[in-house]
Amino acid sequence: MTKQLKLSALFVALLASGTAVAGEASVQGYTVSGQSNEIVRNNYGECWKNAYFDKASQGRVECGDAVAAPEPEPEPEPAPAPVVVVEQAPQYVDETISLSAKTLFGFDKDSLRAEAQDNLKVLAQRLGQTNIQSVRVEGHTDFMGSDKYNQALSERRAYVVANNLVSNGVPVSRISAVGLGESQAQMTQVCEAEVAKLGAKVSKAKKREALIACIEPDRRVDVKIRSIVTRQVVPAHNHHQH
C-alpha cells in the first residue's frame, strides 16, 4: 500500500473513532471510556468534560458538578394516642367529728366556752368547702338526770353549735341539728362498775364526782359530715400505649 493510502486509511479510522467518541460524549457531557463506559478521570481524580458539557443539565454529583438532592424528610412519628380519663360517678364519704362537751360547754350548761369559739371557727372553714354535701349536728348527754331534761339539753347544745357554724360561713341549707339525749350514752355500765370499786369508805360526793368524770365522753356533740368525692381514673390499657 502506498504511503498516501496508509495516511488516508489512518485519517478515516481516526475520524470514525472521533465521531464515535464525540457522539457518546455529547450525550453525557463527559469523556467516557469505550471499554468500561465510565467517566474518564485525570491524575487528580477530576472528571474530564468535553465540549458538549452543560453543567446545568448534565452535571453529576460524583464529579462535583451538581448538588445531591436532599434526602426526604423522615415520616413524622405518629402522635401518641390521647389518654382517656374516665370520671367516676360521685361517691359519698361520711365522717364523724366528736366534740367533747367539756371543751364546748360548762357542766350542765349550753353556752359556748371562749376557746370553743375558736375551734368551731376552724371547723366551719372546712365545712364551707364546696364538696361538703350535708352537715348534721347531734347533741348527746350522759345518763344522769331525767330523760326529758337530757333531751332538751342535748337539743339546745346541738342548736348552739349549728348556729355558731352558720355564723362562721357554713351555708344554712346544708346544716341540720338534732338532740338525742342520753339514747346513745355508752359509758354508763363501765363507769358505774368503776365507781363501785371505790368501796364504802369513799363518800357519796366523791363517788358522784368520779362518776361524772368517767362518763364525760357521753357528753358530746357529734358533727356528721357527708362529702362528695369524684375521682378521675386512667384506664389500665392506656399505660401500655406508646
Swiss-Prot record:
Chain positions covered by the region annotation 7 X 2 AA tandem repeats of X-P: 69-82
Cited Pfam families: OmpA
Sequence repeat residue numbers: 69-70, 71-72, 73-74, 75-76, 77-78, 79-80, 81-82
PROSITE patterns: OMPA_1, OMPA_2
UniProt topology in membrane: Multi-pass membrane protein
Subcellular location: Cell outer membrane
Signal peptide as annotated in the record: 1-22
Location of the OmpA-like domain: 92-229
Cellular component, GO, one term: cell outer membrane
Coiled-coil portions: none
Cysteine pairs bridged by disulfides in the record: C191-C214
One annotated GO biological process: monoatomic ion transport
Keywords: Cell outer membrane, Disulfide bond, Ion transport, Membrane, Porin, Repeat, Signal, Transmembrane, Transmembrane beta strand, Transport
Principal subcellular localization: membrane
Molecular functions (GO terms): porin activity
Alphabetical list of InterPro entries matching this protein: Bact_OuterMem_StrucFunc, OMP_bac, OmpA-like, OMPA-like_CS, OmpA-like_sf
Family: Belongs to the outer membrane OOP (TC 1.B.6) superfamily.
PANTHER family in the record: LIPOPROTEIN YIAD-RELATED, STATOR ELEMENT OF FLAGELLAR MOTOR COMPLEX
Protein name: Outer membrane protein class 4
Species per Swiss-Prot/TrEMBL record: Neisseria meningitidis serogroup A / serotype 4A (strain DSM 15465 / Z2491)
UniProt gene name: rmpM
